[in-house]
Amino acid sequence: MTETLSPSRRGQATPQPDAHPPDARPGFEVYDPEFEAVLGRYARLALVAETDAHEGPVYVRGEDALYFTTVPRAPGGPARGAPRAVIKRLALNGLNLPATPARLSTVPAPVYMPNGMTLGQDGRLVVCEQGTRSEPARISRVDPATGRVETLVDGWGGLSLNSPNDVVVRRDGTIWFTDPSYGYLQGFRPEPQVGDYVYRFDPGSGRLSVVADSFCKPNGLAFSPDERTLYVTDSGANAEPGSYHVDRPHHVVAFDVLDSRHLGPGRLFAVTTPGFPDGITVDRGGRVYASASSGVQVYSRAGDLIGQIRLPGTVNFTFGGPGGQVLFITTDTAVWAAVLATTGAGQSDG
């Protein structure tokens, strides 16, 4: 399915996203003229491939390929064992869509419940492994070509991590990640030993530091183009599997980055509705993209909702494509591509 935004729709008033039913047709919604700069004249939304793409999308330009982690599934059914997930690679062909199933392959890496991922400065994948009851939660580095896995960090102060969820690499090489206790709540991790924190890891010194502890369930995170601001989603409204508590956090928090290693006091940036935010990214203009149950919501630098890529089931997304102007979106059942007129902030993929 593909939709091109026609000029006639740009001047029409559009209802807010929570007015749309869950089965709303994929497309674009303009709430503010600023979103027209994001869309350009030829924006379109296309199905790339039907597959179990869940989290961690990473585009590698040198391969023209998208890596992602799969929906966790228990072998033989929920009653037969702990859930498992793997890293998959989707070989692309520019914008020749949709992709064929033959272009999907599994990365031969021994990873345990992988979730969020990003591209390291050395071209390897930096992976959030949530762990299991018998395998530790950790941040690892994976060579997708060989499947070789290297542990970067698997504990704080001698205590086990919860279930690392999402990760970003700053230009100085430091690794920032969230560590909510979803693994315990979903039954595949032991009882937590630490809080639901946001961490900064310095591979050079091996030092792991807590940089934020004021979250219910810290989830996605992304830096502004100048890396002076860190945005973190809090999906505390989804505290238990399948639950939604409207009185719990479902918002994006912004922090000033101090001395490249500390965070100032958090401030509310935006509240997402319907649902709760998971994935988050920032474009070259400083606009913030956050997931909601209705799709990808796009906010101005001031925190105003300016538009939406309507795609129910959205989990996470990343900028990529040969020119960097494609937002690849995972929905648990498919990978979609939104062709836009902007690129990601400080895009280093590939």
What are these regions (language model features)?
Residues M1-G350:
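Sequence-structural signature of mature extracellular/luminal beta-sheet repeat domains
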